[in-house]
Amino acid sequence: MQQPHIPVMLNEMLKFLAPKAGESYLDCTFGAGGYSKALLENCDCYVTALDRDPNVIKKAEEIKHNYKDRFDFVETNFGNCFAKLESKKFDGIVLDLGVSSMQLDIPDRGFSFLHDGPLDMRMSGQGLSAEEFINTAEEKDLADVIYKYGDETFSRRIAKKIVEVRKAARIDSTGKLADIVRSCIGFRKGKIDPATKTFQAIRIYINNELGELEQFLANVKNILKKDGRLVVVSFHSLEDRIVKNFFKENSEKPVARSKYAKEDIMLNPDKWLKIITNKAEIPSDKEISLNVRARSAKLRAAKKI
Protein backbone atom coordinates (compact mmCIF):
# COMPACT_ATOMS: atom_id res chain seq x y z
CA MET A 1 0.00 0.00 0.00
CA GLN A 2 1.40 3.38 -1.00
CA GLN A 3 1.84 5.98 1.71
CA PRO A 4 0.55 9.52 1.06
CA HIS A 5 3.28 11.76 -0.30
CA ILE A 6 4.38 14.38 2.22
CA PRO A 7 6.78 17.02 0.85
CA VAL A 8 9.79 17.44 3.14
CA MET A 9 10.44 20.87 4.72
CA LEU A 10 7.68 22.42 2.62
CA ASN A 11 7.20 25.50 4.82
CA GLU A 12 10.93 26.17 4.92
CA MET A 13 11.15 25.81 1.14
CA LEU A 14 8.42 28.43 0.68
CA LYS A 15 10.02 30.72 3.25
CA PHE A 16 13.42 30.81 1.54
CA LEU A 17 12.19 30.69 -2.05
CA ALA A 18 9.71 33.48 -1.21
CA PRO A 19 7.49 33.10 -4.32
CA LYS A 20 5.77 36.17 -5.76
CA ALA A 21 2.94 36.58 -8.27
CA GLY A 22 4.08 36.83 -11.86
CA GLU A 23 7.47 35.24 -11.20
CA SER A 24 8.69 31.94 -12.61
CA TYR A 25 10.11 29.00 -10.69
CA LEU A 26 11.92 25.78 -11.56
CA ASP A 27 11.16 22.60 -9.60
CA CYS A 28 14.08 20.36 -10.57
CA THR A 29 12.76 17.23 -8.85
CA PHE A 30 9.01 17.01 -9.50
CA GLY A 31 8.36 13.58 -7.95
CA ALA A 32 4.76 13.54 -6.71
CA GLY A 33 4.44 17.27 -7.38
CA GLY A 34 4.35 18.46 -3.78
CA TYR A 35 6.65 21.46 -4.22
CA SER A 36 5.21 22.47 -7.61
CA LYS A 37 1.65 22.39 -6.31
CA ALA A 38 2.58 24.34 -3.18
CA LEU A 39 4.21 27.08 -5.26
CA LEU A 40 1.22 27.31 -7.59
CA GLU A 41 -1.19 27.49 -4.65
CA ASN A 42 0.94 30.05 -2.80
CA CYS A 43 0.58 32.81 -5.39
CA ASP A 44 -0.18 33.48 -9.05
CA CYS A 45 3.27 32.37 -10.24
CA TYR A 46 4.55 30.08 -13.00
CA VAL A 47 6.28 26.74 -12.45
CA THR A 48 8.37 24.56 -14.76
CA ALA A 49 9.00 21.09 -13.34
CA LEU A 50 11.61 18.50 -14.29
CA ASP A 51 11.88 14.77 -13.65
CA ARG A 52 13.60 11.89 -15.43
CA ASP A 53 11.08 9.36 -14.09
CA PRO A 54 8.42 8.65 -16.76
CA ASN A 55 6.10 7.35 -14.04
CA VAL A 56 5.41 10.89 -12.78
CA ILE A 57 3.99 12.15 -16.08
CA LYS A 58 0.40 11.30 -15.08
CA LYS A 59 0.72 13.41 -11.93
CA ALA A 60 2.22 16.26 -13.98
CA GLU A 61 -0.72 16.08 -16.40
CA GLU A 62 -3.15 16.44 -13.47
CA ILE A 63 -1.42 19.61 -12.30
CA LYS A 64 -1.28 20.91 -15.87
CA HIS A 65 -5.04 20.36 -16.16
CA ASN A 66 -5.67 22.39 -12.99
CA TYR A 67 -3.19 25.22 -13.56
CA LYS A 68 -3.12 25.45 -17.36
CA ASP A 69 -0.37 27.73 -18.73
CA ARG A 70 1.03 28.41 -15.27
CA PHE A 71 2.63 24.95 -15.24
CA ASP A 72 4.93 23.08 -17.61
CA PHE A 73 6.63 19.71 -17.26
CA VAL A 74 9.83 18.54 -18.96
CA GLU A 75 10.88 14.89 -18.80
CA THR A 76 14.62 15.15 -18.17
CA ASN A 77 17.19 14.81 -15.42
CA PHE A 78 18.11 18.17 -13.95
CA GLY A 79 21.83 17.73 -14.62
CA ASN A 80 21.17 17.86 -18.37
CA CYS A 81 18.17 20.19 -18.41
CA PHE A 82 19.79 23.32 -19.79
CA ALA A 83 19.32 22.70 -23.52
CA LYS A 84 15.70 21.65 -22.99
CA LEU A 85 14.90 24.80 -21.03
CA GLU A 86 15.68 26.85 -24.15
CA SER A 87 17.44 29.79 -22.46
CA LYS A 88 14.67 30.32 -19.89
CA LYS A 89 15.63 32.08 -16.67
CA PHE A 90 13.93 31.73 -13.31
CA ASP A 91 13.26 33.82 -10.22
CA GLY A 92 13.75 30.78 -8.03
CA ILE A 93 14.96 27.20 -8.30
CA VAL A 94 14.40 24.32 -5.89
CA LEU A 95 15.93 20.85 -5.73
CA ASP A 96 14.65 18.09 -3.45
CA LEU A 97 17.38 15.48 -3.80
CA GLY A 98 17.17 11.74 -3.37
CA VAL A 99 14.42 9.21 -3.96
CA SER A 100 10.72 10.12 -3.86
CA SER A 101 8.15 8.40 -1.68
CA MET A 102 6.38 7.15 -4.82
CA GLN A 103 9.52 5.36 -5.95
CA LEU A 104 10.03 3.83 -2.52
CA ASP A 105 6.45 2.63 -2.20
CA ILE A 106 6.23 0.79 -5.54
CA PRO A 107 7.96 -2.61 -5.12
CA ASP A 108 8.53 -3.03 -8.88
CA ARG A 109 10.82 0.02 -8.89
CA GLY A 110 13.30 -1.86 -6.71
CA PHE A 111 14.22 1.01 -4.39
CA SER A 112 12.85 -0.29 -1.10
CA PHE A 113 14.15 -2.95 1.27
CA LEU A 114 10.73 -2.99 2.96
CA HIS A 115 8.95 -4.43 -0.10
CA ASP A 116 10.28 -7.37 -2.11
CA GLY A 117 10.58 -6.58 -5.80
CA PRO A 118 12.95 -6.63 -8.78
CA LEU A 119 16.39 -5.25 -7.94
CA ASP A 120 16.28 -2.23 -10.25
CA MET A 121 16.67 1.24 -8.60
CA ARG A 122 16.89 3.16 -11.90
CA MET A 123 15.01 6.45 -11.72
CA SER A 124 14.71 6.71 -15.50
CA GLY A 125 14.46 2.99 -16.22
CA GLN A 126 17.57 3.24 -18.41
CA GLY A 127 21.21 2.30 -17.94
CA LEU A 128 22.85 -0.08 -15.48
CA SER A 129 20.40 -1.64 -13.02
CA ALA A 130 21.17 -2.46 -9.40
CA GLU A 131 20.80 -6.15 -10.24
CA GLU A 132 23.46 -5.95 -12.95
CA PHE A 133 25.81 -4.05 -10.65
CA ILE A 134 25.33 -6.36 -7.67
CA ASN A 135 25.89 -9.50 -9.74
CA THR A 136 28.85 -8.36 -11.86
CA ALA A 137 30.91 -5.84 -9.88
CA GLU A 138 34.21 -6.82 -8.30
CA GLU A 139 34.13 -7.28 -4.53
CA LYS A 140 36.39 -4.24 -4.01
CA ASP A 141 34.14 -2.05 -6.17
CA LEU A 142 31.06 -3.18 -4.26
CA ALA A 143 32.75 -2.38 -0.95
CA ASP A 144 33.94 1.02 -2.17
CA VAL A 145 30.48 2.05 -3.40
CA ILE A 146 28.74 0.92 -0.22
CA TYR A 147 31.29 2.73 1.94
CA LYS A 148 31.58 5.92 -0.11
CA TYR A 149 27.89 6.54 -0.79
CA GLY A 150 26.41 4.86 2.27
CA ASP A 151 28.89 5.64 5.05
CA GLU A 152 28.56 1.93 5.85
CA THR A 153 31.15 0.68 8.36
CA PHE A 154 30.52 -2.95 7.39
CA SER A 155 30.94 -2.37 3.65
CA ARG A 156 33.70 -4.95 3.15
CA ARG A 157 31.81 -7.62 5.07
CA ILE A 158 28.67 -6.93 3.02
CA ALA A 159 30.56 -6.98 -0.29
CA LYS A 160 32.23 -10.28 0.59
CA LYS A 161 28.87 -11.84 1.47
CA ILE A 162 27.27 -10.58 -1.76
CA VAL A 163 30.02 -12.23 -3.83
CA GLU A 164 29.66 -15.50 -1.87
CA VAL A 165 25.88 -15.63 -2.30
CA ARG A 166 25.84 -14.75 -6.02
CA LYS A 167 28.19 -17.67 -6.78
CA ALA A 168 25.35 -20.01 -5.82
CA ALA A 169 22.41 -18.03 -7.24
CA ARG A 170 21.80 -14.67 -8.86
CA ILE A 171 20.72 -11.89 -6.49
CA ASP A 172 17.68 -10.60 -8.33
CA SER A 173 15.34 -9.08 -5.75
CA THR A 174 15.37 -6.36 -3.11
CA GLY A 175 14.37 -8.92 -0.51
CA LYS A 176 17.39 -11.12 -1.23
CA LEU A 177 19.81 -8.19 -1.06
CA ALA A 178 18.24 -6.82 2.12
CA ASP A 179 18.51 -10.24 3.81
CA ILE A 180 22.19 -10.50 2.84
CA VAL A 181 22.95 -7.11 4.36
CA ARG A 182 20.97 -7.84 7.52
CA SER A 183 22.80 -11.14 7.98
CA CYS A 184 26.09 -9.20 8.00
CA ILE A 185 25.01 -6.57 10.51
CA GLY A 186 21.98 -7.77 12.45
CA PHE A 187 19.08 -5.78 13.84
CA ARG A 188 19.43 -3.47 16.82
CA LYS A 189 16.27 -2.39 18.58
CA GLY A 190 15.33 1.22 17.94
CA LYS A 191 17.85 1.63 15.11
CA ILE A 192 17.24 2.06 11.39
CA ASP A 193 17.02 -1.05 9.23
CA PRO A 194 20.56 -2.42 8.61
CA ALA A 195 19.89 -2.42 4.86
CA THR A 196 19.24 1.35 4.74
CA LYS A 197 22.78 2.52 4.03
CA THR A 198 23.58 -0.15 1.46
CA PHE A 199 20.40 0.49 -0.52
CA GLN A 200 21.05 4.23 -0.40
CA ALA A 201 24.62 3.77 -1.62
CA ILE A 202 23.68 1.57 -4.56
CA ARG A 203 20.85 3.91 -5.59
CA ILE A 204 23.13 6.96 -5.53
CA TYR A 205 25.75 5.13 -7.59
CA ILE A 206 23.34 3.64 -10.14
CA ASN A 207 21.69 7.00 -10.82
CA ASN A 208 24.89 9.09 -10.69
CA GLU A 209 23.11 11.37 -8.25
CA LEU A 210 26.18 13.24 -7.03
CA GLY A 211 27.54 13.74 -10.54
CA GLU A 212 24.20 15.08 -11.67
CA LEU A 213 24.10 17.52 -8.74
CA GLU A 214 27.61 18.78 -9.48
CA GLN A 215 26.79 19.20 -13.18
CA PHE A 216 23.65 21.19 -12.38
CA LEU A 217 25.35 23.48 -9.88
CA ALA A 218 28.15 24.19 -12.36
CA ASN A 219 25.59 25.63 -14.79
CA VAL A 220 22.79 26.96 -12.59
CA LYS A 221 24.11 30.54 -12.71
CA ASN A 222 23.01 30.73 -16.35
CA ILE A 223 19.32 30.07 -15.62
CA LEU A 224 18.90 32.04 -12.38
CA LYS A 225 17.83 35.68 -12.64
CA LYS A 226 19.48 38.44 -10.60
CA ASP A 227 18.15 38.29 -7.03
CA GLY A 228 16.83 34.82 -7.86
CA ARG A 229 16.94 32.23 -5.10
CA LEU A 230 18.33 28.70 -5.10
CA VAL A 231 17.00 26.28 -2.47
CA VAL A 232 18.42 22.77 -2.08
CA VAL A 233 17.09 20.03 0.20
CA SER A 234 19.53 17.13 0.64
CA PHE A 235 19.32 13.84 2.52
CA HIS A 236 22.92 12.61 2.51
CA SER A 237 26.11 14.06 3.95
CA LEU A 238 27.88 13.93 0.57
CA GLU A 239 25.05 15.84 -1.12
CA ASP A 240 25.01 18.45 1.62
CA ARG A 241 28.79 18.83 1.46
CA ILE A 242 28.66 19.46 -2.29
CA VAL A 243 25.97 22.14 -1.83
CA LYS A 244 27.69 23.72 1.17
CA ASN A 245 31.04 23.95 -0.62
CA PHE A 246 29.44 25.27 -3.80
CA PHE A 247 27.67 28.04 -1.89
CA LYS A 248 30.84 28.91 -0.01
CA GLU A 249 33.06 28.97 -3.11
CA ASN A 250 30.64 31.19 -5.04
CA SER A 251 29.40 33.53 -2.31
CA GLU A 252 30.28 37.15 -1.78
CA LYS A 253 32.73 37.86 1.02
CA PRO A 254 32.32 40.70 3.54
CA VAL A 255 35.65 42.58 3.64
CA ALA A 256 36.63 45.35 6.09
CA ARG A 257 38.66 48.07 4.32
CA SER A 258 40.41 48.94 7.60
CA LYS A 259 39.98 48.18 11.24
CA TYR A 260 38.25 51.55 11.64
CA ALA A 261 35.89 51.19 8.68
CA LYS A 262 32.54 49.48 8.73
CA GLU A 263 32.44 46.09 7.08
CA ASP A 264 31.95 46.46 3.35
CA ILE A 265 31.07 44.03 0.56
CA MET A 266 33.88 43.64 -1.95
CA LEU A 267 32.32 42.14 -5.04
CA ASN A 268 34.37 39.75 -7.11
CA PRO A 269 32.99 38.84 -10.56
CA ASP A 270 33.49 35.19 -9.67
CA LYS A 271 31.42 35.54 -6.52
CA TRP A 272 27.78 35.61 -7.57
CA LEU A 273 25.89 34.16 -4.60
CA LYS A 274 24.80 35.45 -1.23
CA ILE A 275 24.09 32.71 1.30
CA ILE A 276 20.76 33.27 3.08
CA THR A 277 20.84 30.29 5.43
CA ASN A 278 23.54 30.86 8.06
CA LYS A 279 23.70 27.11 8.54
CA ALA A 280 21.69 24.22 7.19
CA GLU A 281 18.03 24.29 8.19
CA ILE A 282 16.71 21.00 9.56
CA PRO A 283 13.16 19.65 10.01
CA SER A 284 11.30 20.26 13.24
CA ASP A 285 10.75 17.39 15.66
CA LYS A 286 7.05 17.62 14.82
CA GLU A 287 7.69 17.14 11.11
CA ILE A 288 9.96 14.16 11.75
CA SER A 289 7.28 12.57 13.96
CA LEU A 290 4.77 12.97 11.11
CA ASN A 291 7.16 11.99 8.32
CA VAL A 292 10.14 9.82 9.28
CA ARG A 293 11.65 10.33 5.81
CA ALA A 294 12.40 13.92 6.80
CA ARG A 295 14.79 12.91 9.58
CA SER A 296 18.02 13.36 7.58
CA ALA A 297 16.93 16.38 5.51
CA LYS A 298 18.98 19.59 5.36
CA LEU A 299 17.99 22.76 3.52
CA ARG A 300 20.39 25.40 2.24
CA ALA A 301 19.49 28.56 0.32
CA ALA A 302 21.35 31.31 -1.52
CA LYS A 303 20.52 34.32 -3.70
CA LYS A 304 22.12 35.46 -6.95
CA ILE A 305 23.65 38.94 -6.64
Swiss-Prot record:
This is Ribosomal RNA small subunit methyltransferase H. It catalyses: cytidine(1402) in 16S rRNA + S-adenosyl-L-methionine = N(4)-methylcytidine(1402) in 16S rRNA + S-adenosyl-L-homocysteine + H(+). GO terms for biological process: rRNA base methylation. Belongs to the methyltransferase superfamily. RsmH family. GO terms for molecular function: rRNA (cytosine-N4-)-methyltransferase activity. Specifically methylates the N4 position of cytidine in position 1402 (C1402) of 16S rRNA. NCBIfam families: 16S rRNA (cytosine(1402)-N(4))-methyltransferase RsmH (TIGR00006). It holds the Pfam family Methyltransf_5. It comes from the Bacteria. The gene is rsmH. Keywords: Cytoplasm, Methyltransferase, rRNA processing, S-adenosyl-L-methionine, Transferase. It comes from Rickettsia bellii (strain RML369-C). Its EC number is 2.1.1.199.
